């Protein structure tokens, strides 16, 4: 018999969170239910999943097609829901007809909001941490620190993407015995190994990510500009949703100031279905992520796994759990956070690298992802966690 798991989100589902859909899809022998006070009809409303669509959206008769439609209203609604949890009260009544065996909240603050529901119904709660919720959320909202303490005490299990995430949660008081490592993962066959030929003295770099501070876009541009004088046959392509408008303006100014227009191509949001083919045009993926002033961070970016799966080495930083995804001197090169000179040196090294050495990096990258980040294995481990909580025999 399948385990019934109710997955809890703020919104189902922004395109940039397609990885969450893939986690649910890869977990075997689970009857998936999804609850969120904001639902979107953007390709993730599977017929075999049960969705608790908010009543007000049912009254409207249609759902927004993406995260950009009705954005201002969505933000107001979610803030209102945090103060007056009307949707959660409705959900408590609705789940009585298909009562789940487990609740699985995605992101720490979501877990805090649904903890009273778990306590009232007696349904075990699993909470997954991914990024901003590790340190940024409790820094900006100090009241969350106490709520995290209660969450760590009452939840059946807490998941983190890697050892750094585990250490951060333990430092905040989460018992080690409750923490389960569930790495960010992907399907390697969706990004099959692609043969590239690398000549010394040429390099095409690419960075694909939502344009926010923690992704390190300005560090990429500065390192690229620093390396350019020694690496004239180099190009950089940037792609991603332009979320942080102030950062976008700063990037534009930097490109103009240093006359990089002929060397830097800047694209908009790229659908995930096009990403694998798009990456064939480049030799190295770069993402120098770092902490922001408000302690926003990456858990473990899926994009650098996808790039490596396709045989592309990665330049990144020793930020959070990224060193478990990219192995220094084996599948890519790592620099310290905000080390522009170090990043430039990594770029220059790949620029002058010959094909034989490049192929070693390429083969290692693909094998590393296939062996350690196949989402089907992650799904099996997650299902085993559910079984352990419910004391189900394997």
Mark where each language-model region is.
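Acidic donor-binding loop of glycosyltransferase active sites
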Residues: 280-295, 312
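Nucleotide-activated donor-binding/catalytic signature segment of Leloir-type glycosyltransferases, i.e.
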Residues: 248-273
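Donor nucleotide-sugar binding/catalytic pocket of nucleotide-sugar-dependent glycosyltransferases
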Residues: 130, 145-193
